[in-house]
Regions:
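Conserved N-terminal catalytic/coupling substructures associated with nucleotide/phosphate chemistry
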Residues: 1-175
């Protein structure tokens, strides 16, 4: 446990136990880590005071985590389950890598939601970030998106003239 900072951050999240009945509570963090810069969910540490309480039945917890990530996150991100013991207590570190196939969605009840990590929170990705994640997953940038305009139909001179005309900076002599 001494390898982990004692505070939640952009790349670490503490969970006292696996919430089997509320998997969204931690699966959104898996999505957020995969869509951002990766991170670790550490099971067996109480969130409020960072007290190491350990886990009961580490094998069952590991199996359930793996099953739910594989079923509920799409595409499945790179992740590792690292069970370990400290002071006679069992813990599970779930290391989630950031991935190239963004966005990584959490799926539930027919709805897909992409999350990002912001500070110590996992938040639903706003539209502009979701669009950037989609482009990243396609290995594209905004500059690389095809346009409907032909190169000969656009120029900085034409843009400048149109802007001045629309802004009323050019007086039309015919009026």
């Amino acid at each position: 446990l001494k390898d982990f900072d004692n505070v939640e951050s952009t790349n670490i999240d503490f969970k006292e136990f696996l919430e089997k009945d509320r998997p969204k509570s931690w699966l959104k963090t898996v999505s957020a880590f995969a869509n951002t810069k990766g991170g670790t969910i550490l099971y067996g540490v109480r969130d409020e005071d960072r007290e190491p309480v350990g886990l009961d039945n580490i094998a069952e917890v590991s199996s359930k985590v793996s099953k739910l990530i594989n079923c509920k996150i799409s595409p499945v991100p790179r992740y590792e389950l690292n069970p370990f013991e400290d002071n006679g207590k069992d813990f599970l570190a779930v290391n989630v890598g950031d991935g190239p196939e963004t966005p990584y969605y959490y799926s539930s009840d027919g709805r897909k939601t992409a999350y990002i990590r912001s500070g110590d929170q996992s938040l639903e990705a706003p539209d502009h970030i979701l669009k950037a994640l989609i482009l990243k997953g396609q290995n594209k940038t905004y500059d690389g998106i095809a346009t409907e305009y032909k190169l000969e139909d656009v120029s900085f001179t034409l843009l400048d003239a149109t802007l001045k005309k629309e802004a009323g900076l050019i007086v039309n002599k015919d009026r």
